[in-house]
Structure formats: structure tokens, C-alpha cells
Regions:
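Hydrophobic membrane-insertion alpha-helices, especially the h-region
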Residues: 5-21
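Soluble extracytoplasmic domains of inner/organellar membrane proteins
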Residues: 113-195
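N-terminal beta-strand/beta-hairpin edge segment
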Residues: 41-119, 126-134, 138-151
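N-terminal positive-inside, membrane-proximal cytosolic segments immediately preceding the first
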Residues: 1-2
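N-terminal amphipathic/hydrophobic interface segments
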Residues: 19-51
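Extracytoplasmic/luminal low-complexity segments enriched in Pro/Gly and acidic/polar residues
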Residues: 185-231
């Protein structure tokens, strides 16, 4: 009888251990792996809490905090990204089927991303192939980029100014001026030479987030986004 009772206790302890620690750890690890893949980075810290802890295994998260360094979303390179949430439910059926982190409900979910000068320089170099020696400066007034390019077979110096803006959920660099100085043709102002530079389409924002605020400050652009509270 004692052996049976002992065996029963061991089974209960194993089930409790599985429910309280092992399954939640597996769920957290799986979500972290997806974040790493989605944001093209391996520098991720994921913290998720629920009471009881076993709720994490079915996607019910009381508190969530994800911190990412050197992330990529769309054509945006982010120096830092923080995602915070409360009462978040992840659709685990969808996650298990196609590894998509789909949020079906959230009481609160917000994102804060930081784009530094080096990150914007990379965007300009990739989006405008004709630019060399690109340097970017960010101030509260906006973005100033200097570079060299070829114009009519001769090297020219350019100065581009603009701002990171949002329109109907799409994030892009809106050019405000483009000045080109060339020894052969003198000084030209060609505002429409390159046009606006798209960074992120609205549908590429993760977890139903919508951009709510963009702030330019010395050395960086802050992007803030939120998911509207679900009823």
C-alpha cells in the first residue's frame, strides 16, 4: 500500500513539475526562437509570467517583456526594441501549425523601437545604390545625410534632409530637400530625384500593433506603437 501511495505521490509531483516548470519553459523557448527568426537577431531576452505558470503553455500570459538588440522589421534596422504586454493571449494552435506568433487578445501591448544614425545609414546605402560615403545625423529637427554620388559622369556631393513619418500605418523617410553640388553643373536642388523611402508596410507590423508616435532626438528616432485594447 505504501509503495502504491508513494508511486501516486511521485506521479503527482512529476505532473506538477511538468505543468509548473517544464511546459512553460518549452513555450517560452519556442516563442523566443520565433522572435529571433522574425527579427533577424540572436540578442533577445524574453520574460513571460502567468499565475499559475502552466497558463503559459496554452498562450495565456499575464505579463510579457521582450527586449531585442539589433533587430530588423521590414527595411527598418532597430538598435533596440522593447515589447511589453499585459493579459496577452497567443494563438497556440496557429503557433504550432505555422510558427506564427499571432495575438488573439491583449489588454495592453506596446512597442518601443530605437533607430540610430548607423541604422539609418544602412537603410540609405541599401535603398539608394548610387550613394557612397554616407553619413547620417539625427536631431530633433529631423535627418540630415551627406554622401557622394556620380552625376553626368562626375562625382557630386549631396545633402539630403528629411524625417521619419507614418502615413496610414506605413513607415517611411519623407524627403524634404536634396541638394547636389557638382563642379560641372554648379549647385542643383532636385527634391524629387530619389523620392520617399519606404521602411515598413502597415501589414508588416507584428501582433496587430499600430504606430502611434515618432520622435526625433539627438542621435536617434524613437518609434512607438500600440495595439488597441480588445473588448
Amino acid at each position: 500500500m505504501r509503495k502504491v501511495l508513494l508511486g501516486f505521490v511521485i506521479i503527482l509531483a512529476a505532473v506538477a513539475l511538468l505543468a509548473q516548470f517544464i511546459l512553460p519553459a518549452i513555450a517560452t523557448s519556442a516563442i523566443k526562437a520565433k522572435v529571433v527568426s522574425r527579427l533577424s537577431t540572436d540578442d533577445v531576452d524574453v520574460s513571460m509570467q502567468s499565475d499559475p505558470n502552466v497558463l503559459l503553455a496554452i498562450g495565456d500570459i499575464d505579463k510579457m517583456n521582450i527586449v531585442v538588440h539589433r533587430a530588423t522589421i521590414g527595411a527598418v534596422y532597430l538598435r533596440d526594441l522593447t515589447l511589453q504586454g499585459k493579459k496577452v493571449h497567443i494563438d497556440m494552435a496557429s503557433f504550432l501549425e505555422d510558427q506564427a506568433v499571432s495575438v488573439s487578445h491583449a489588454e495592453q501591448l506596446s512597442l518601443r523601437g530605437v533607430i540610430g544614425e548607423n541604422e539609418l545609414r544602412r537603410v540609405l546605402e541599401e535603398k539608394i545604390s548610387r550613394l557612397d560615403n554616407v553619413e547620417v545625423r539625427i536631431t530633433p529637427d529631423g535627418i540630415t545625410a551627406t554622401a557622394n554620388t556620380k552625376l553626368f559622369g562626375r562625382k557630386a556631393d549631396i545633402v539630403l534632409t528629411g524625417k521619419v513619418v507614418e502615413d496610414e500605418g506605413t513607415l517611411f523617410i519623407k524627403m524634404t530637400s536634396l541638394n547636389i553640388k557638382n563642379a560641372l553643373i554648379g549647385r542643383a536642388k532636385l527634391d524629387d530625384m530619389f523620392g520617399n523611402i519606404e521602411l515598413l508596410k502597415a501589414e508588416k507590423m507584428p501582433m496587430g500593433l499600430k504606430i502611434t508616435n515618432i520622435v526625433h532626438q539627438d542621435g536617434e528616432v524613437i518609434i512607438e506603437a500600440e495595439r488597441r485594447p480588445d473588448k
